[in-house]
Amino acid sequence: KQYFYKEKILNIPTRDWMYVFTCLILGTGVVVNSIFKNLWGRARPNDTIQFNGDEPFTIPWLNVDYCDTNCSFVSGDVSFFTLSLAVLIIFNKQSWNTYAYIGIGLISLLRIMEGDHFFSDTIMSFIITYVIIKVLYNMFQHFPEDLNLNSLKPINFSKVKWRSRKDSNPD
């Protein structure tokens, strides 16, 4: 069975498309939206006492319980828009980076003006996503351009020798 397309799409190698897909899933999906937004209970500005809400204002890195899901810290919209930098990297369009940064700034400003995020939420979202993009880029450069995932063989877990904690502890 063929699970991945072997040819270049838009003249971009498979490795680079896998890089962008991984940035989307890991950066915006897992780290920003699943971990920070759902585990960091910072209330949105509209929900704080200072803006006629019921919850108190909290500093960005303080993990509190004023919001259950889809909380303020960090901004998923800014994270998703920061992924445009990853796409620009694979298209080798450094001249467009200025436009990407302007777009990220405008999205951040819009989210702040709507009362959905604090300034720190948008800045930290950009920093977290940018670091993930750069780390993944450096990792993916070690893979061949014509990355063919169809040639990978699945692990046969029935042949794996499992060790218990008792086996690994010499006491």
At which residue positions do the language-model features occur?
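Membrane-interfacial segments
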Residues: 3-8, 35, 39-44, 95, ...
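Membrane-interface interhelical connector segments
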Residues: 39-67
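Membrane-water interface at transmembrane helix exits
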Residues: 27, 31-32, 36-41, 89, ...
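Alpha-helical transmembrane segments of multi-pass membrane proteins, especially transporters
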Residues: 20, 24-25, 51, 125-126
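Membrane-embedded catalytic cores of phosphoryl/pyrophosphoryl-handling enzymes
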Residues: 56-162
